[in-house]
Amino acid sequence: MDMGNQHPSISRLQEIQKEVKSVEQQVIGFSGLSDDKNYKKLERILTKQLFEIDSVDTEGKGDIQQARKRAAQETERLLKELEQNANHPHRIEIQNIFEEAQSLVREKIVPFYNGGNCVTDEFEEGIQDIILRLTHVKTGGKISLRKARYHTLTKICAVQEIIEDCMKKQPSLPLSEDAHPSVAKINFVMCEVNKARGVLIALLMGVNNNETCRHLSCVLSGLIADLDALDVCGRTEIRNYRREVVEDINKLLKYLDLEEEADTTKAFDLRQNHSILKIEKVLKRMREIKNELLQAQNPSELYLSSKTELQGLIGQLDEVSLEKNPCIREARRRAVIEVQTLITYIDLKEALEKRKLFACEEHPSHKAVWNVLGNLSEIQGEVLSFDGNRTDKNYIRLEELLTKQLLALDAVDPQGEEKCKAARKQAVRLAQNILSYLDLKSDEWEY
């Protein structure tokens, strides 16, 4: 269409649609709740655009009326998606679990850093249980839910790490103030750092409305400046004492994100954890083996070497340190399932090929089970390649195919044959495992 001759109302609708499009990704990725500032901001923008669309004069022309209708529908769709993201049952579940963590911190941790008793085993067990439950919240591959779960997990994991680090490595101090005039100042700073640790935890967990990340960062930086200004006169033990306190402050500073005060989780990234990196290394190699198998013209030549290497990868995963962290435990559990599923795929392929070589008379029911196993092998190959979420047509198709195989197995009558009964039971377990694996893959769990 010649833009110079385009009707002004159509041009205006296109401008509005462009503005609506500019916030679409923010809406899709919105991971907060309906009382968040960003929710209200996005809702306000979209509602304003709806009014703007409604005010466009169609002059009774059909093409303009249709264009206005389409623009309104797209804006309403985004408003609906924003509302659904904020009120999704699993988003509410994440928030409820987070509020449990807040109560735990309020009750057990804030008093501790205000001079109370030490952190209890009850707190450690409680926080681990909360993290574990969060790792099991299903996202269905939905971006907003994945973000919400990730942000909540990283905040709670940050608190866990701060506390464990503090309990594990208390500085070799305080030194006697008689040793040197600077010691009194270092002792004072150390007490301030302990208080700041409690403030930081309260900030991360949203239980302190009187402090900001920016202000706390300034306070901690000021404490480092005070320590740097001290004259320790070459005294090694005092210099070491000061260094330990500075290191403690720097550890706290890494959790503060000055660029986005509202999003403190960016400072804590579990993906940099040593155990997670080992798991990722194993998964990378597993994917390479999987791709080689699925793309090979004659995969049977790779079965033995691939299976041997995959079993070695299981051994490497067994050696991964869990560090009392449920996130790492969940990451390892998923990695073991990934590797084990590929081993099972090879085992079934080998069994099917062996059966072809040694064909013999068999019970009709047993033959029916083997036919289903052949189908399951083909479906499992597709599931291994699947990379989507539960709303994808391919997910639904694979789920239906697997359900059909389970129904086919249910229809098999073993007629009292024990061997057939055992084979059918094993085939049912395999089909259920493939379904579970498809579910796990579509969840797109993140660290």
Curated annotation (Swiss-Prot):
GO cellular component, one term: cytoplasm
Tissue note: Expressed in the heart.
Record Pfam families: BAG
GO biological process: Golgi organization; negative regulation of neuron projection development; negative regulation of oxidative stress-induced intrinsic apoptotic signaling pathway; negative regulation of proteasomal ubiquitin-dependent protein catabolic process; negative regulation of protein refolding; negative regulation of protein ubiquitination; protein folding; protein stabilization
Keywords: Cardiomyopathy, Chaperone, Disease variant, Repeat
Molecular-function GO terms, alphabetical: adenyl-nucleotide exchange factor activity; protein kinase binding; protein-folding chaperone binding; ubiquitin ligase inhibitor activity; ubiquitin protein ligase binding
Positions of the BAG domain: 9-86, 95-167, 182-260, 275-350, 365-442
Domain notes: The fifth BAG domain is responsible for the interaction with HSP70 nucleotide-binding domain.
Disease tied to this protein: Cardiomyopathy, dilated, 2F: A form of dilated cardiomyopathy, a disorder characterized by ventricular dilation and impaired systolic function, resulting in congestive heart failure and arrhythmia. Patients are at risk of premature death. CMD2F is an autosomal recessive, early-onset form.
Functional description taken from the UniProt entry: Co-chaperone for HSP/HSP70 proteins. It functions as a nucleotide-exchange factor promoting the release of ADP from HSP70, thereby activating HSP70-mediated protein refolding. Has an essential role in maintaining proteostasis at junctional membrane complexes (JMC), where it may function as a scaffold between the HSPA8 chaperone and JMC proteins enabling correct, HSPA8-dependent JMC protein folding. Inhibits both auto-ubiquitination of PRKN and ubiquitination of target proteins by PRKN.
Subunit structure comment from the entry: Binds to the ATPase domain of HSP/HSP70 chaperones. Binds PRKN. Interacts with HSPA8 and JPH2.
Name by which UniProt lists this protein: BAG family molecular chaperone regulator 5
